[in-house]
Amino acid sequence: MSDSKEITKVIVTMVVISAVAAALLALTYTPTQAQLKLLQAEQQKEAMKEILPQAADFEPVTGSEVDDDGNPVVLYYKGVDSSGNVVGYVVERNQVGAQGMIQLLAGISSDFSTITGFQVMKHSETPGLGALITTPEFQGQFVDLPVADTSLTKNGGQVDAISGATISSQAVVDALHSAVDYVSAQEG
């Protein structure tokens, strides 16, 4: 009898501890998520300024879909100068890389002829190989690069692939072409 009482006592204790831990986790989750969203929005704004520096402001272009919070989903951003003239576009693209999804922001000139730059926002590429898509040396190749030349050198373009990470390099090129095609179809 005493063994079953001991087992019951241990089980009840574990259930109470688990319930308290779950309650604490639930209490901290919501404020943490809100703070995380604010931080991500700030990082995105900084990245947009870097890849389209001639823009004084970014106007969101939304579609008919809404997110989980009921806000319209942003399709892309129009970069405008201080007079309100469109100087380019910034669009988020997701592309499958060698190890997972690569999420990047692409800057495109207002006439859709030039990549103004890009920033990787998230990735799960191999450290020391595919992760080198985040380096200034790789990303610098795309600053003011004509869209027609936005392909790897092995394919006749002007982009040097990262040695040992051709799939990741090609994924970036594909994402940039997808970005240009998408925005030009929406705006053109």
From Swiss-Prot:
Keywords recorded for this protein, A-Z: Cell membrane, Electron transport, Flavoprotein, FMN, Membrane, Phosphoprotein, Translocase, Transmembrane, Transmembrane helix, Transport
Binding partners and assembly: The Rnf complex is probably composed of eight subunits, including RnfA, RnfB, RnfC, RnfD, RnfE and RnfG.
A GO cellular component annotation in the UniProt record: oxidoreductase complex
GO BP, one annotated term: electron transport chain
Record carries keyword Cell membrane: yes
Organism superkingdom: Archaea
Membrane topology: Single-pass membrane protein
Protein name in the entry: Ion-translocating oxidoreductase complex subunit G
PANTHER family, per the entry: ION-TRANSLOCATING OXIDOREDUCTASE COMPLEX SUBUNIT G
Any GO molecular function: oxidoreductase activity, acting on NAD(P)H
E.C. no: 7.2.1.-
Stretches assigned to the Extracellular side: 31-188
Observed effect of gene inactivation: Deletion of the rnf operon abolishes growth on acetate and ferredoxin:heterodisulfide oxidoreductase-coupled Na(+) transport.
FMN phosphoryl threonine carried by residues: 166
Effect caused by changing residue 166 to G: Abolishes flavin binding
Annotated compartments: Cell membrane
Job description of the protein: Part of a membrane-bound complex that couples electron transfer with translocation of ions across the membrane. Catalyzes Na(+) transport, most probably coupled to electron transfer from reduced ferredoxin to methanophenazine and heterodisulfide reductase. Involved in heterodisulfide reduction during methanogenesis from acetate.
Family membership: Belongs to the RnfG family.
Required cofactor names: FMN
Chief localisation class: membrane
Chain ranges passing through the membrane: 10-30
Residues in compartment: Cytoplasmic: 1-9
SMART domains in the cross-refs: FMN_bind
